[in-house]
Design a protein with these regions (language model features):
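C-terminal-of-GTPase-core extension/linker across diverse P-loop GTPases
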Residues: 63-186, 202-204, 220, 230-322
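Short, Asp-centered acidic motifs that coordinate Mg2+ and/or phosphate
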Residues: 191, 223, 252
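Inter-motif core of Ras-like GTPase G domains
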Residues: 207-231
Length: 322
């Protein structure tokens, strides 16, 4: 909405600097961070959600996160909100007509029609709200908690996924006391791996604190990797985790150190790996990536990734149902 002026000059840094010096001496100034986005918003060229998406594009660290932000900047989320607003206005108009002519023998919509309209709007809001699980995970990274008993190879697994010795590995049980977080890009999606303290009964106060942090990491993870090893299986250790999981959490049970017991039968539903020599790691990467369905990103579907948008939709849904 503003008239621009473009200066084409020689590529010399001195010439560019001199032009900028002359312009600023004549009253011009350098643009501040995000100033062109602000001007576009104030001029009505972008709405607030599109302006927020500009920052998300700049901060995106994966192909999926970039596609998500680009879709929002193109107006995908704005279009979904516009459709929602139209439905709400239609419902409001019907309610106002009923109130204005309540004493007349005129019925513009019966209660069943109004209830059905409210249910459709509620379903629209819920669909947007539910997309936040995927949107936020793509934007912030999919949280994956690596859990299990001490010395089953959790830190070795993280090092193998990173292809570097990032985490200290030791034969001494309880070496990992704090949660170590690392980000890994798997086929265009960022995963946040949380290497946690081994879970066991202990009197060590410091180790107990580490286990408490492990449980907190499990609670906020989208995917939980529960690790055991071939020796523990042979000794009758439980295959399934002994801590509760949410219904929406994905669980992977890994049997590590299969190279030390190649004849050990794997229980149904488990995945055999060797974090030390890399056996099964590529298969694990593919399984993790399959948990994140990004097809909707490339079809233009509206996906919520902003906490403010999610809270506003939650408030709208609550108000509709009151």
């Amino acid at each position: 909405g503003e008239d621009p002026a473009e200066i084409s000059c020689h590529g010399s840094q001195y010439i560019v600097s001199e032009i900028l010096r002359l312009l600023t001496a004549s009253g011009a100034r350098m643009a501040g961070p995000g100033e062109f986005t602000i001007r576009a918003y104030l001029a009505g060229k972008l709405d607030l959600s599109q302006a927020e998406a500009v920052a998300d594009i700049i901060a995106s660290s994966s192909r999926a996160a970039h596609a998500l932000a680009a879709n929002q900047m193109r107006g995908g989320y704005s279009d979904a909100l516009e459709g929602l607003c139209e439905k709400l206005l239609e419902l409001t108009a019907l309610l106002e007509l009923e109130l204005d002519f309540s004493e007349e023998e005129v019925e513009f919509a019966d209660r069943a029609q109004l209830r059905e309209a409210m249910q459709r709007i509620g379903a629209h809001i819920d669909a947007l709200r539910n997309s936040f699980t995927l949107g936020n995970a793509i934007k912030e990274g999919v949280a994956v908690a690596i859990t299990g008993a001490p010395n089953v190879g959790k830190s070795t697994l993280l090092n193998r996924l990173l292809n570097e010795e990032r985490v200290l590995v030791s034969d001494i049980a309880g070496t990992t006391r704090d949660v170590i977080e690392e980000r890994i890009n798997i086929d265009g999606v960022v995963f946040r791996f949380l290497d946690t303290a081994g879970i066991r009964a202990t009197d060590d106060r410091l180790e107990q604190m580490g286990i408490q942090r492990t449980m907190s990491s499990i609670e906020r993870a989208q995917i939980v990797i529960y690790m055991t090893d071939a020796a523990r299986l042979a000794a009758g250790a439980p295959v399934a985790p002994e801590f509760p999981l949410r219904a929406d959490q994905k669980l992977l049970v890994l049997v590590n150190k299969t190279d030390t017991a190649p004849d050990c039968p794997l229980p149904e539903g488990t995945i055999g790996i060797s974090a030390r020599n890399g056996d099964g790691i590529e298969s694990l990467r593919r399984i993790l990536r399959s948990f994140v369905d990004t097809e909707a990103l490339y079809h233009g579907d509206a996906i919520v990734s902003n906490n403010r948008h999610y809270e506003a939709l939650t408030a709208a849904g609550d108000a509709l149902r009151r």
